[in-house]
Amino acid sequence: MKFIDEARIEVIAGDGGDGSASMRREKFVPFGGPDGGDGGRGGSVIAVADRNINTLIDYRYAKKHLARNGENGRGADCYGKGGDDITLRMPVGTTITDMETGELIADLTEHNQSVQIAQGGAGGLGNLHFKSSTNRAPRQKTDGKPGERRMVRLELKVLADVGLLGMPNAGKSTFISSVSNARPKIADYPFTTLAPNLGVVRVGPSRSFVIADIPGLIEGAAEGAGLGHQFLRHLQRTGLLLHIVDLAPFDESVDPVAEAKAIVNELRKYDELLYEKPRWLVLNKLDMVPEDEREARVSAFIEGFGWDGPVFEISALTGQGCENLCYAVFDYIAAHSDAQRAAEAEDLAADVRFRAKPADPVAADDSGVDPQQ
């Protein structure tokens, strides 16, 4: 199936039904009075996150989604039937934005999370609501309200703990296939990866994390060059970025330091927050470097790149160093997840809305004896 991570659709909620201006006409009831019922409400448009859906391809071709209108009210105090809601099922990780106002309507991050994105119109009032002591036979009634109509943009941002960065053919797909069950296409030409790939890395029982591989970046990606700029949004939810560098390029004229700096510059141009995410340096293809040259080549790269963060030396093809890297990544994610939960708990405790009310003092009766003793 083709991977589609963006779509634009129009959602139209149902209109409310009109109220009825009806009079009770019945034998032996000379002054029946008003009996017009209200109109039914219009159907709403609801978005639901579904973990069994992986792409927005259904919305690339179905551009308009309409809910049903409410029925009109009728006589004999009959209210109109409400319009049925429609449900749009989307992948977990989808954001929904109003294209006219720029408002973020919803961010679907959990399975079965539901959000109303277009509200149905309210039904009109029948004339039975307008009777009074001075107006026994009202002819007034109100029409139903129109439902909301919106043009929205759907964007899928995959949910992963770790994202892979690097130039084409740096070995990102080889790495993710080495440490997980993901099987992306691997070949010796650039842009083999055309869509994001997700893999689950297990480091022990109930100990795992999700890693995302996106198409390789090239210089100018933030301005539209290559493919990577289309998929950088998928790294925005990650907690850690692994910058994979090819230390042994086939073309000897290629400078790994210059390529690594180009990747960092593209991150900064695309999104400052993404640039500031924690980033580790992963030097790949060490099996292609003679053993007596490895230390010198690694030191020269780190010095030329001006890097002072964590560095890991691996060979994704042979698996050398991959296990230690995965354990380090899991420990980092687990530690930061615990810290985030603790911070959220502190924020919750500081919120006055959730503070426990102090117990009321126990009043003594006239005899001076505590009634609870």
Swiss-Prot record:
Pfam families: GTP1_OBG, MMR_HSR1. Residues 160-334 form the OBG-type G domain. It comes from the Bacteria. Belongs to the TRAFAC class OBG-HflX-like GTPase superfamily. OBG GTPase family. Monomer. This is GTPase Obg. Its EC number is 3.6.5.-. Its main location: cytoplasm.
